[in-house]
A protein has these predicted regions:
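Periplasmic N-terminal accessory/gating domains of Gram-negative outer-membrane beta-barrel systems
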Residues: 79, 86-89, 115-211, 222, ...
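Gram-negative outer-membrane beta-barrel transporters
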Residues: 516-521, 623-625, 644-728, 817-819
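Transmembrane beta-barrel wall of Gram-negative outer-membrane proteins
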Residues: 236, 242-265, 278-317, 341-370, ...
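Structural signature of Gram-negative outer-membrane beta-barrels, strongest in the C-terminal barrel
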Residues: 421-423, 444, 493-624
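Short, acidic, small-residue-rich periplasmic hinge/interaction motif at the N-terminus
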Residues: 32-37, 43-45, 72-78, 88-133, ...
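Membrane-embedded beta-barrel scaffold of Gram-negative outer-membrane proteins
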Residues: 365-369, 558, 566, 594-652, ...
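Surface-exposed extracellular loop regions of Gram-negative outer-membrane beta-barrel proteins
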Residues: 218, 254-273, 285, 320, ...
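C-terminal beta-signal and adjacent terminal beta-strands/loops
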Residues: 665-668, 719-727, 752-820
Length: 820
């Protein structure tokens, strides 16, 4: 079976299908008159094709993709509106024109969405791809991790690192509102659902660095999500062995009010129960999201984004056997567990947004949001282990069992960690357009209140002896001198904190776009300012301020070749969030400074036709110089900071992505990334940073059977070289510069569309707009990837063995999707 799958994947890349499907995109929206009323019976047309708006003014028009199309809106006694646009294959774009009173007046608005994003250094992809692409955590993040410069070595986690940064250095916006992730997550299997709901998504934009001043104060990347507005009643259901989702949307008869809501449920048992640790595992990840809009008038619109999530995680490990070593010297670790872990995460998020169009050239926005979370991490787990040789005698009834134990011991881990946080934001933004010039500005106030209790320890016993912490200055001269020190845990951390952080930040930026020197020139310059005050209730409050100037320049020469050259340079600061203020002893250090990074990014985009189909080659070379670096350790997905600005670092590399229609009518890409990042802590010399992932290859591929186009395939393959790590958490990184094994994974999804727009349902399926069934194969080659090591000592030789903690093996999943 596996051999056939390998052959299939090779054939996919060598023998591309010869069938040709039409390339289309969808333009939709609502037509309004000057009074804000929807226009029924208006004609929406391009070339010789067209549709008429329904009684609510709604239209849906399919147009050719990857080419400039002029669309005209016309209605008796109203001005004719005409505009040109270029959309990608399968892209959905919403446009709501306003037709003023008059007759036969022709105005033109040139709109090239992809081109505008390209000159700003933004990568965009269809949300439909995020909905259909296969992955351990399918959705937007699964697609991101196939991009160059983006790495993630845990299929159960939605967290990602970009160009040498860590998980805390990425901005995520939904409808221009910043969203947050949980604080106490230690492993991917605890995470559950991502905030971003791919079924509600209309646009996905991503920048891997060198982004503009209008985005916030983080060092690495920006993910900008826009939720969609339904144009008619809709409902969809997605079911699988991993959970399910129900999404419902509708609008009012006059088109002023729209509502979109979704309920999601996820159960990771399919993944966790397939791992080598036998468990009683009962996770329950549930969330509810809603997006509401109301058009008060032609100038004022209100929006609401809300979410509530309840995550319950109950984990009771029973036994584990991990085989390692070589063929000549096979070894195994056998562990028996007692105890359990019970975690709870309760999150509520709400945001209000008002958009007011003062004039055709001036738009303002007011936003207010609140994020509240209550998190609990409680566990008491006793692990008793045996380390020894494995019985390899074929035919023996004890084949594969551990015998001749070389290490016997136990480990007790305990935690009572609780956290409550309330984050409130008030934000104002404005945009002024004057000819080829555009000015944007913003001002934001944030108040963060975090209450945290940490109480955790680890006790290790080996052959009846309690192992003391690995302290450098510890001395034990037994039996010559009596040792009367108390027994202490091998590792411990405790503390209680109540911290209030107040922030005021703002930005102003100017953009210019016009023809210059036989080409098109785009300039952008801006600056951010950020002032914050930390009050921990114990020490005197600390106030700091940073300024971050940034600039971009893009040039697109006229001519037969579609090329774009781009330069970005700027200073990026990351003022400390709560996690970065807390050291490894769980103490808050208010004096921690903002980390600073100077970015230089050179980019080149080249669009061309291959096999008479469109392709684009994106290339970027980047360099980062970082100062006031706050060192951290990475264990699984848990970050622990030193809360010291005692390091400097650098990162440089190359990102390349070839995207296009490898198969007619579908978008796929192949990506390559090279990265080197090192840090110098306390002038001890440069060493690898925890996210120094040297090479990255990614393939995201869509295919179909030419004679049966409803049978489709989705392939997601990633290869990452190993991260520095795998050493004990207490180890000095200057003493342990080892790397984990390379991360290799391929996920395959196959689906069949029983009902769609061009294939109406019959019989029991007649009430569905679309209906599809499929199967997913995760980790199709059954590669054993590891993200951490468990260290066990041999009592006889005093040698410590690094036992890999493997991630998920090959898993099969069934999937069903239906739309009404």
């Amino acid at each position: 079976m596996i051999k056939r799958l390998k052959t299939l994947i090779v054939l996919v890349f060598v023998l591309l299908p010869f069938g040709l499907l039409s390339q289309t995109a969808t333009l939709k929206g609502i037509v309004f008159d000057g009074e804000g009323n929807s226009v029924s019976g208006a004609t929406v047309a391009y070339a010789n094709q067209g549709v008429v708006t329904d009684r609510n003014g709604v239209y849906v028009l399919e147009i050719p993709a990857e080419k400039k199309v002029t669309v005209t809106f016309s209605f008796l006694s109203l001005k004719t509106v005409s505009f040109a646009l270029t959309l990608a294959a399968n892209e959905d774009y919403e446009f709501n024109p306003v037709m003023q009173a008059d007759i036969e007046v022709f105005g033109e608005l040139v709109l090239d969405v992809k081109k505008r994003k390209r000159i700003e250094g933004i990568q965009s992809f269809s949300p439909e791809m995020a909905r259909k692409m296969v992955g351990g955590n399918s959705g937007v993040e699964a697609v991101l991790m196939s991009l160059p410069g983006v790495s993630g070595n845990n299929e159960l986690s939605t967290q990602y690192a970009v160009r040498g940064g860590n998980y805390d250095e990425n901005l995520v916006y939904v409808n221009e509102i910043e969203v947050y992730r949980p604080f106490l997550i230690r492993s991917g299997q605890q995470e559950g659902l991502s905030f971003v709901n791919s079924q509600m998504t209309a646009n996905v934009d991503f920048s891997a660095g060198g982004f503009q001043a209008k985005y916030g104060d983080k060092l690495s990347s920006v993910l900008d999500i826009t939720y969609r507005r339904p144009t008619d009643f809709e409902a969809s259901v997605d079911l699988s062995l991993l959970g399910g989702q129900l999404t419902v949307g509708d609008k009012s008869e006059d088109g002023r009010f729209t509502a979109l809501g979704s309920v999601r449920y996820r159960d990771n048992s399919l993944f966790v129960n397939a791992k080598e640790t036998e468990t009683n595992f009962r996770p329950r990840f549930t969330d509810l999201q809603s997006y509401l809009t109301y058009k008060v008038s032609n100038k004022l619109e209100l929006g609401f984004l809300g979410t509530a999530s309840i995550n319950d995680y109950r984990y009771e490990p029973l036994t584990r056997q991990t085989n390692f070593g070589t063929i000549q010297d096979p070894r195994a670790l056998l562990v028996f567990y007692e105890g359990q872990e019970v975690d709870q995460y309760r999150t509520v998020f709400g945001a209000l947004k008002a958009t007011y169009v003062i004039s055709d050239n001036y738009t303002t926005k007011w936003m207010a949001s609140a994020y509240q979370t209550a998190e609990q991490e409680h566990y008491d787990i006793l692990a008793q282990y045996r380390l020894g040789e494995v019985n390899t005698s074929i035919g023996d009834e004890n084949l594969g069992e551990v015998e001749f134990s070389e290490g016997i011991g136990s480990q007790l881990t305990h935690a009572r960690n609780d956290l409550e946080a309330l984050i409130v934001n008030i934000n104002h933004r404005g945009q002024i357009q004057s000819g080829v010039h555009q000015v944007e500005y913003g001002l934001k106030y944030t108040n963060e209140r975090i209450r945290d209790r940490v109480s955790e320890y680890e006790i290790i016993d080996s052959a009846g002896f309690s192992i003391r912490p690995p302290l450098v200055d510890f001395q034990n001269n037994q039996p010559y001198e009596a040792f009367d020190s108390p027994i202490v845990p091998f590792n411990a951390s405790s503390g209680e904190n109540d911290v209030v952080i107040s922030r005021i930040s703002g930005f102003a930026q100017w953009s210019y776009r016009d023809e210059w020197n036989n080409g098109e020139l785009y300039l952008n310059a801006g600056v951010r300012a950020h002032n914050w005050q930390v009050d921990d209730g114990v020490n005197a409050s600390v106030t700091q301020t940073v300024f971050s100037p940034r600039a971009q320049m893009s040039f697109k020469p006229f001519g037969s070749k579609d090329q774009l050259f781009r330069l970005s340079v700027g200073v990026y600061h990351q003022p400390p969030f709560y996690r970065e203020l807390r050291n490894r002893q769980s103490e808050v250090v208010p004096q921690v400074k903002a980390q600073q990074s100077i970015h230089l990014v050179l980019g080149h985009d080249y669009s061309f036709n291959l096999w008479e189909r469109p392709f684009t080659l994106n290339s970027e070379v980047f360099y980062k110089h970082l100062t006031d670096v706050n060192p951290y350790t990475l264990e699984n997905v848990r970050l622990r900071y030193a809360a010291l600005n005692n390091a400097v670092a650098y990162a440089y590399g190359l990102d390349m992505r070839l995207a296009g229609e490898f198969v007619p009518g579908t978008e796929s890409w192949v990506s390559f990334g090279y990265l080197k990042t090192e840090e110098n802590i306390d002038d001890r010399g440069f060493i690898f940073r925890p996210t120094d992932q040297r090479l990255k290859f990614g393939v995201l591929f869509q295919d179909y059977v030419p004679v049966m186009p409803d049978l489709k395939m989705y392939l997601n393959m990633v290869y990452n070289t190993g991260l520095p790590g795998g050493s004990p958490s207490y180890a000095d990184p200057y003493d342990f510069q080892t790397r984990l094994p390379d991360y290799k994974r391929a996920d395959l999804g196959i689906s069949y569309d029983l009902v769609h727009d061009n294939k109406p349902g019959k019989g029991l399926l007649s009430s569905f707009k679309d209906f599809a069934v499929g199967v997913e194969i995760f980790n199709i080659f059954d590669v054993q990837n590891s993200i951490t090591n468990t260290f066990v000592r041999d009592v006889y030789t005093k040698v410590q063995y690094a036992i890999p903690n493997y991630l998920t093996p090959r898993i099969f999943n069934l999937k069903l999707s239906a739309g009404f």
